[in-house]
Curated annotation (Swiss-Prot):
This is Sulfite reductase [NADPH] hemoprotein beta-component. It catalyses: hydrogen sulfide + 3 NADP(+) + 3 H2O = sulfite + 3 NADPH + 4 H(+). Siroheme binds at residue 474. Component of the sulfite reductase complex that catalyzes the 6-electron reduction of sulfite to sulfide. This is one of several activities required for the biosynthesis of L-cysteine from sulfate. Keywords: 4Fe-4S, Amino-acid biosynthesis, Cysteine biosynthesis, Heme, Iron, Iron-sulfur, Metal-binding, NADP, Oxidoreductase. Its EC number is 1.8.1.2. It comes from Xanthomonas oryzae pv. oryzae (strain KACC10331 / KXO85). GO terms for biological process: cysteine biosynthetic process; hydrogen sulfide biosynthetic process; sulfate assimilation. Disruption phenotype: Cells lacking this gene display a blocked APS- (adenosine-5'-phosphosulfate) or PAPS- (3'-phosphoadenosine-5'-phosphosulfate) dependent cysteine synthesis but do retain AvrXa21 activity. SUPFAM superfamilies: Nitrite and sulphite reductase 4Fe-4S domain-like (SSF56014), Nitrite/Sulfite reductase N-terminal domain-like (SSF55124). It is an enzyme of class 1 (oxidoreductase).
């Protein structure tokens, strides 16, 4: 018998439930129904292979249950030793691949139940965990991966890691179930000062951005911290609240939202403001209607001024006025760049973040070889790419030799700038919410679009493309200049008009259409863009569509164009 998510949380004995009994049940590859909810807080989702679901049903077999495991890696920074260990885990327990998420975490796919605990223990042995990587808690904290700002990145990373640790659940359930920690008196009744016994109404996302780069898409986060840098010195952070991508097809009560900038805080105020924002959502969020439970709806339902006043009351101080800042783009810089500290950083484009050895790529082997050099560190970017960071000039030649040997820079040499910067969620065959393909379709769609780009001289023009298998928007499609949002197998909603800076939502342009219809809809728009764009100001595709009157801002009830780019 299943229960409501709120009941499952409150009766779980601080996220324990009957997980240990579910794991021990050898009769099925699945967990008990309520435990399928609880395991999310431990960093895993129960899934099945949808490609063979019908076949197994015909054979009177249960679905091919498997588990996705997601790491908690604030800012996506790991050492070469950790990389090698995670590579080994993927090879031994998962489907021989690693996947970089849009929130700078790793996902392992294809882990079966009887190996779930061993996999969790192996991950923790690397000094990485999976606690709170999923569930109605604060998720993995994003950090700008800007390799040019070496000192700023180090400071942002330290602040983000501090916030991540501060907002972890206090329960010992994770350590008891997966790491065999001895139970003590009071086990199952630990105090949760931030989350309480029902945790948050829905998931919560935090990002740290470093202008002029908005690679984290900070305005898609529930809570954003925008670094204010002057002469290389970090003064503090502008605070943004209320971003979120998820929506439901055909439901006018749901919509994506860009965040509001509400003020400025100093570094020593970070934890107080983060706690105030999270607990405000905990107490004001909608627990009766789950699809309306995200913080963006809390703000829209109660009013921005009311929520900001409550945050200030809980923090014990009013935020200072927001400081000037400006974003230039939300993509990655590919190739080598030298940081302020004289170390070098190589950004590699990895299509949809998938790292595997296939018929056409040897990314897993190649990055293993680079990790074995034991130089620098690895940084996952919010665009699902990878930075080999902190490389001394004397080691560049060795890295370059391996990059060439394994063709790791093939993505950097993609036929179009659009393909290099495109993102996609996993979707089929493992995501239970997917309505259409995304990751597996991205190469084909990019290739289908390529002739149009070449025809109009746009192959080298950066256009933000994102694919999502469903309207929940894990690939942040609603901020893209071109987005496909899955509606049914082979059919998508075509969304147009976001911008390169991650500051404007796009708009539904055509609904429930196939690839030929998508290409037919895009061709005249790309033709006009090529002929009429403002070259002098490097006008983006989304900006052109609005200037030319070819598309309007979305008509979401609370959406308005926010003046986010303050004069620096």
């Amino acid at each position: 018998m299943s229960h409501s998510v709120e009941d499952i949380k409150s009766e779980s004995r601080r996220l324990r439930g009957s997980l240990e009994q579910s794991l021990a049940d050898a009769v099925t590859g699945a967990l008990r129904e309520d435990d399928q909810t609880l395991i999310k807080y431990h960093g895993s989702y129960q899934q099945d292979d949808r490609d063979i679901r019908d076949e197994r049903r015909q054979q009177k077999l249960e679905p091919a249950y498997q588990f996705m495991i997601r790491t908690r890696t604030p800012g996506g920074v790991i050492t070469p030793a950790q990389w090698l260990a995670l590579d080994g885990i993927a090879t031994r327990y998962a489907n021989h691949s690693l996947r970089i998420t849009t929130r700078q975490a790793f996902q392992f796919h294809g882990v079966i139940k009887r190996e779930l605990k061993a996999t969790m223990q192996a991950i923790n042995a690397t000094l990485i965990d999976t606690l709170a990587a999923c569930g109605d808690v604060n998720r993995n904290v994003q950090v700008a991966a800007n390799p040019l700002l070496s000192q700023a990145h180090a400071t942002l990373y330290a602040d983000a890691a501090c916030v991540s640790e501060h907002l972890l659940p206090n329960t010992r359930a994770y350590y008891e179930i997966w790491l065999d920690e001895e139970r003590v008196s009071g086990s199952g009744n630990e105090d949760e000062p931030i989350y309480g016994d029902r945790y948050l109404p829905r998931k919560f996302k935090i990002g740290f951005a470093a202008p002029p780069l908005n690679d984290v898409d900070v305005f898609a986060n529930d809570l954003g911290f925008i670094a204010i840098l002057r002469d290389g010195r970090l003064l503090g952070y502008n605070v943004s609240i209320g971003g979120g991508m998820g929506a439901s097809h055909g439901d006018a009560q749901t919509w994506p939202r860009v965040a509001n900038v509400i003020g400025f805080v100093t570094r020593d105020q970070l934890l107080d403001i983060a706690t105030a924002v999270v607990t405000t959502q905990r107490d004001f969020g909608n627990r009766a209607v789950r699809k309306r439970a995200r913080f963006k709806y809390t703000i829209d339902d109660h009013g921005l001024d009311t929520i900001v006043a409550e945050i200030a009351r809980r923090a014990g101080f009013a935020l200072q006025p927001a400081q000037p800042f400006a974003f230039e783009h939300n993509g990655d810089r590919y190739g080598w760049v030298e940081g302020e500290d004289g170390l070098w950083h190589l950004t590699l484009s990895l299509p949809a973040g998938r790292i595997a050895d296939t018929d056409t790529a040897t990314h897993l082997s190649g990055l293993r070889a680079i990790a074995q050099l034991n130089v620098g560190e690895f940084r996952m970017t919010p665009n699902q790419n990878l930075v080999i960071a902190g490389v001394p000039a004397s080691e560049r030649a060795r890295v370059d030799a391996l990059v060439a040997q394994y063709a790791l820079d093939a993505g950097n040499r993609s036929a179009s700038a659009l393909a290099r910067g495109a993102m996609a969620c996993v979707a089929l065959p493992t995501c239970g919410l997917a309505m259409a393909e995304a990751e597996r379709y991205l190469p084909d769609f990019s290739a289908a679009l390529q002739p149009l780009l070449q025809q109009h001289g746009l192959a080298d023009t950066p256009i933000v493309l994102r694919l999502s298998g469903c309207p929940n928007g894990c690939s942040r499609p609603y901020l893209a200049e071109i987005a496909l949002v899955g509606k049914a197998p082979g059919r998508y909603n075509l969304m147009l008009g976001g911008d390169r800076r991650g500051q404007r939502l796009n708009t539904l342009y055509r609904e429930n259409i196939t690839e030929p219809e998508i290409l037919a809809a895009l061709e005249p728009l790309l033709a006009r863009y090529a002929a009429e764009r403002d070259h002098a100001n490097d006008e983006g595709f989304g900006d052109f569509l609005h200037r030319a009157g070819l598309i309007a801002l979305p008509s979401y009830p609370t959406h308005r164009r926010l003046d986010l780019e303050l004069l620096a």
